[in-house]
């Protein structure tokens, strides 16, 4: 998906002769914000290990492409639809905990062990719509898909899936300043709500299920682009 969108951006960016406005905007953005979540690992015998709520600051750079719907009648003509994604992978770091001595799925005694999970966001795609309230103020709503790759280090009897896709929503608002040559600048606030996910241990120690609770947070975003 990244390669397709980048190709579209390059195509529009290299267009120097436009016979008429086509209602397309392309640009780049940077955002900084904070997300919070918690997680747990549950054993089939009812034992639960729950983490504290973790908060983390993060920053991303991305690109976007939009198309206005000015051809629609009435207030619908104030709508635009767009696609946004980060232009790089985002390292989420690692988290460790210690599992107490337990009985594995086959009844064997598992000694106390250290488990470490590393995570990296490889895609942060947003499909969204904006509504121009005025010439400079707009509202935004959309859906989010976050692709995460994880690496688990722990007991040899434990194995968790490494590729995960999380879905969520985004709501926001922003202000835009445009110039006569088509260049524009934006300031934007976004509020995210991303669904959590549960995964089952795929190793021989299959009595455990790890759960990431819902992720929530907000970001401030700046963007610059050009309208065609």
Predicted regions and their residues:
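Cleavable N-terminal export/targeting peptides
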Residues: 1-23, 228
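Short coil turns and loop connectors of transmembrane beta-barrels in diderm outer membranes
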Residues: 16, 20-22, 71-77, 123, ...
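Short glycine/proline- and aromatic-enriched beta-strand/turn motifs that initiate or cap beta-hairpins
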Residues: 19-96, 101-107, 111, 219-223, ...
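Residues on the lipid-exposed face of transmembrane beta-strands in outer-membrane beta-barrel proteins
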Residues: 28-30, 61-67, 83, 127-133, ...
């Amino acid at each position: 998906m990244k390669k397709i969108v980048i190709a579209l951006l390059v195509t529009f960016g290299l267009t120097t002769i436009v016979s008429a406005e086509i209602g397309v905007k392309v640009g780049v953005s940077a955002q900084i914000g904070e997300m919070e979540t918690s997680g747990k690992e549950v054993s089939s015998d009812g034992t639960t290990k729950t983490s504290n709520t973790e908060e983390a600051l993060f920053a991303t750079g991305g690109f976007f492409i939009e198309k206005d719907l000015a051809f629609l009648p009435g207030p619908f003509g104030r709508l635009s639809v767009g696609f946004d994604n980060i232009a790089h992978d985002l390292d989420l770091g690692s988290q460790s905990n210690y599992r107490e001595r337990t009985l594995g799925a086959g009844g064997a005694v598992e000694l106390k062990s250290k488990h470490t999970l590393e995570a990296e966001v490889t895609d942060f795609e947003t499909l969204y719509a904006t509504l121009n309230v005025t010439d400079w103020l707009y509202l935004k709503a959309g859906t989010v898909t976050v692709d995460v790759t994880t690496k688990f280090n722990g007991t040899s009897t434990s194995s968790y899936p490494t590729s995960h896709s999380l879905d969520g929503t985004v709501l926001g608002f922003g202000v835009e300043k445009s110039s006569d040559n088509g260049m524009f600048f934006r300031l934007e606030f976004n509020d995210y709500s991303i669904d959590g996910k549960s995964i089952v241990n795929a190793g021989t120690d299959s009595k455990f299920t790890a759960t990431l609770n819902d992720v929530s947070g907000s970001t401030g975003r700046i963007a610059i682009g050009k309208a065609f």
